[in-house]
Amino acid sequence: NKMSLALVEISEYVTINGLPWLLLAWVSIYIFRPLATIIHEFGHAIPAVIFTRQTVQIKVGAGQGSLHFSIQSIKIEISLKKMICGYTAFQNVNLSNCQLTLIYATGPIFSLMACTVALSLIYTIKFHIALDALWVGWVCSNLLCLLRNVLPLQLQGPESDAVPSDGLQIIRIMRGRTPTES
């Protein structure tokens, strides 16, 4: 039974010997969270480039970026402050509601794919417990990113302004409003 197998594997962490691995998983959540944000934003940027045929900008973190680079038509700026926040900027003037919905949905889809791939690795390949702990941190980081963006909420923005989550943007589009309208 897979459920009992999962519980047995989890129980390895809830012992005095498992405490270091539990701490490693916890710390890796914070280490991987900026990468989870970048993956999520790439989920938005790829269809935005396809639909707009223009350059798209990804910004991760707050303040002036300390790292600037481009990959094809995607300009990336990364700041080391508040790296759990990010956004993808693109021209949405001539996009249909279907295209906008796809752009907003693909960020969470990329986060979900990152979780799914890591979970499948954890359950199909026998890694050392330290690597399992890192994979658990990776899953949790991407799951937090997914939940933060799917729930229809106003989120704390990188510059202290409230920004709508992807879920809220999609609901606004379905109600016939432009994504930035309340």
Residue ranges and their predicted role:
Residues 7-10, 39, 46, 80, ...:
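Hydrophobic alpha-helical segments of integral membrane proteins
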